[in-house]
A protein has these predicted regions:
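Gram-negative bacterial Sec-dependent N-terminal signal peptides
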Residues: 1-33
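Predominantly soluble domains enriched in secretory-pathway, periplasmic, or organellar proteins
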Residues: 35-470
């Protein structure tokens, strides 16, 4: 779920209600003898443009952008504009398949953020506005303040979780798109990062393609000695024994739609799993392992749906926090009753993914991959206090209550940003290829996992323990 590229597709109000404006712009580019400006429009326009930085990296000021167009009509001519400035002197022309490939240079003085690019299409005519994300370049800094120890594990590392009782670290891995045939749950020694146990999930039912119940999200239940995982591809969750990773229960496919995160309240005996892309959090009983009860979150935005992404649990206060991937909101849930206490707008973000919480300041930390920033929200007032540019593609965030610092994985930048509760960037640490997830052990140690770019990538598929020097 990285953000090294951007899908530039017209949606809703971005579509061509701007035909009159385009007609006026076209007058400056046509001769007096040109054809009618208001020609027949493309009533079934579906064109999309995908933009990607060099070799899959972030799009930044001065970088060369690779464009891939699709779903245009053969022969359509595409001109890109920023304001009144034409970005491609010669129009791109869709081939017989309705596609085109091109490159575009981002100006060296381009401001960071979502740049509104106008897509002017002719033959037949259409228009759309799309956001081209220009990511910040945040230099590595203050690396001497942290000791780093890394270990290469399995391909496709996804998440990790730490047992407060034993110090063991549990890591999930899954490789590729369906059918996913390679996936593991690993148990590590928290000190040495040595693998103490590992297991491959059971084969997925109803298929003969070799796919398994691939594991993605992970949460630790120290009260019952279990570890919970999400089976995103099968819309399910599973429970394993911490001691030897033997399977306790595999829930049926369809139990939790696109299950992502899972967190445990050991005192209440409840597990919560996010149904990504829906407004639902599934609530389980960790003793009976019965079918879950759904918690529905309603968006404050009229006509919009809260889309649950990551979860964070404050076990001491029995409060559950969730962020919405689609509506720039966060929700507070009472874990005791399973009811939503409030939904709060988060200003200045797009595509929120990660969430963490600081009980001392009552502040929520929201990592947003669509806007390349970390938002810090005061839950008492509901105000967004700070927005910190951390790098390209912030994906997850964890807050360490010992050193009182938030840690953000920037998937495309390949860094781990360290931010204090007041929005100050304390450090920006190298974290290999595609950092995916970060967690803390409550003792000052931080564990981050990343994914490799390929089989020969020495910097990927690693877990790294970051420990403050002082």
């Amino acid at each position: 779920m990285g953000t090294g590229n951007a899908r530039l597709a017209p949606t809703g109000r971005q579509l061509c209600t701007m035909v009159s404006l385009l007609g006026l712009m076209a007058l400056g580019m046509q001769t007096a003898q040109a054809a009618t400006v208001f020609d027949a429009p493309d009533t079934t326009y579906k064109g999309e443009i995908n933009a990607q930085g060099p070799r899959g990296t972030a799009i930044t000021a001065g970088s060369e952008v690779q464009l891939q167009g699709r779903d245009f009509k053969p022969g359509q001519r595409i001109t890109l504009m920023r304001g009144n400035t034409v970005l491609n002197t010669d129009a791109y022309v869709a081939d017989e398949k309705g596609t085109f490939n091109a490159s575009l240079k981002v100006p060296a003085d381009a401001a960071v953020g979502l740049q509104p690019i106008l897509v002017a299409v002719s033959n037949p005519s259409a228009a759309a506005v799309f956001p081209l994300k220009v990511s910040p370049v945040v230099p590595v800094s203050n690396t001497e303040a942290y000791k780093q120890v890394s270990a290469k594990l399995a391909p496709g590392l996804y998440q990790s979780a730490v047992s407060a009782k034993t110090g063991a670290v549990f890591v999930t891995s899954a490789v590729g798109r369906p059918p996913v045939k390679a996936s593991e749950l690993l148990k590590l020694n928290g000190e040495t990062l040595a693998v103490e146990a590992r297991v491959t999930p059971a084969a997925a039912p109803g298929t003969d393609d070799g796919s398994v119940f691939a594991v993605y999200g992970v949460g630790v239940d120290d009260q019952n000695g279990n570890v919970w995982v999400t089976n995103t591809r099968q819309n399910a969750v599973a429970v394993y024994r911490q001691a030897d990773l033997s399977l306790v229960k595999q829930f049926n496919p369809g139990t939790v739609a696109h299950a992502r995160d899972v967190v445990i309240d050991p005192t209440l005996g409840r597990a919560f799993a996010s149904a990504t892309g829906t407004p639902v959090i599934a609530m389980f009983d960790t003793k009976t392992l019965a079918e879950p009860t759904p918690i529905q979150i309603k968006s404050l935005k009229w006509g919009s749906q809260f889309s649950v992404a990551s979860l964070h649990l404050d076990a001491a206060a029995h409060k559950l926090y969730a962020v919405s991937l689609s509506t720039e909101e966060a929700a507070v849930v009472d874990a005791k009753t399973g009811t939503v206490e409030k939904v709060i707008p988060v200003e200045g973000i797009k595509m929120a993914m990660g969430v963490a919480y600081d009980a001392k300041t009552n502040r929520l930390f929201v990592a947003a991959q669509g806007s390349d920033n970390l938002a810090i929200v005061d839950l008492a007032s509901g105000k967004t206090l700070h927005r910190v540019s951390t790098g390209a593609g912030p994906l997850n965030v964890a807050f360490d209550p010992v050193k009182r610092l938030a840690y953000v994985t920037n998937r495309v930048s390949g860094t781990l940003s360290v931010v204090d509760p007041d929005g100050k960037l304390v450090a920006n640490l190298p974290d290999g290829t595609f950092p995916n997830h970060v967690t803390v052990d409550g003792k000052g140690n931080v564990y981050a996992v990343n994914k490799a770019k390929g089989q020969d990538d020495a910097e990927g598929d690693r877990i790294t323990r970051f420990t403050p020097v002082k």
